[in-house]
């Protein structure tokens, strides 16, 4: 059985996208997205929060879109996969970094919010940008599955939602 390498991130940009052009002329965008988890500490009854930062890279048209429309604070939905790169530093030491290679980018802010942060979006709905099929080893998309019935009662999982640490 093949493995699964899929990441879904919903969060806010920590800074403006960094855009550069590769020698072949294709655009590359690097963004840093924050996700936060909060919960109530059982012992102190205080709200706790942990923020995680994610490095995400987009290529080609998605990189151009990120550079044009995204700004610090923009709320985004990203689908992608983890990739680890290796390079040598100035001292010849091997270095590694793991980042998310973005395949899907969707802006979640309203048009007014994007305009206030300096971005511009002529669309009326939040646009979604998918990486071209077959690029960078992407698998072809599969047909959508039938959604689960919405009239079923929620399952009792044996715990209270307020006590979940995420």
Swiss-Prot record:
Start and end residues of each stretch annotated as Disordered: 114-166
Domain SSB, first and last residues per copy: 4-109
CDD domains, alphabetized: SSB_OBF
Biased composition (Polar residues): 125-138
Keywords: DNA-binding
UniProt GO MF annotations: single-stranded DNA binding
Gene Ontology CC annotations of this record: nucleoid
GO BP annotations listed: DNA replication
Protein name: Single-stranded DNA-binding protein
Native species: Pasteurella multocida (strain Pm70)
Protein encoded by which gene: ssb
């Amino acid at each position: 059985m093949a493995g699964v390498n899929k990441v879904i991130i919903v969060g806010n940009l920590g800074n403006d996208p960094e855009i550069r052009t590769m020698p072949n002329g294709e655009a590359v965008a690097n963004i840093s997205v924050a996700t936060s988890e909060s919960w109530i500490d059982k012992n102190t009854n205080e709200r706790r929060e942990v923020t995680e930062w994610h490095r995400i890279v987009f290529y080609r048209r998605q990189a151009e879109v990120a550079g044009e429309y995204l700004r610090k604070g923009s709320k985004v939905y990203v689908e992608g996969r983890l990739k680890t790169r290796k390079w040598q530093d100035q001292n010849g030491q091997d270095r590694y970094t793991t980042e998310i290679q973005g395949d899907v980018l969707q802006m979640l802010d309203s048009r007014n919010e994007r305009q206030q942060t300096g971005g511009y979006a002529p669309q009326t709905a939040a646009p979604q940008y998918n990486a071209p099929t077959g690029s960078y080893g992407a698998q072809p998309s599969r047909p959508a599955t039938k959604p689960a019935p919405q009239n079923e009662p929620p399952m009792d999982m044996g715990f209270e939602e307020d006590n979940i640490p995420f």
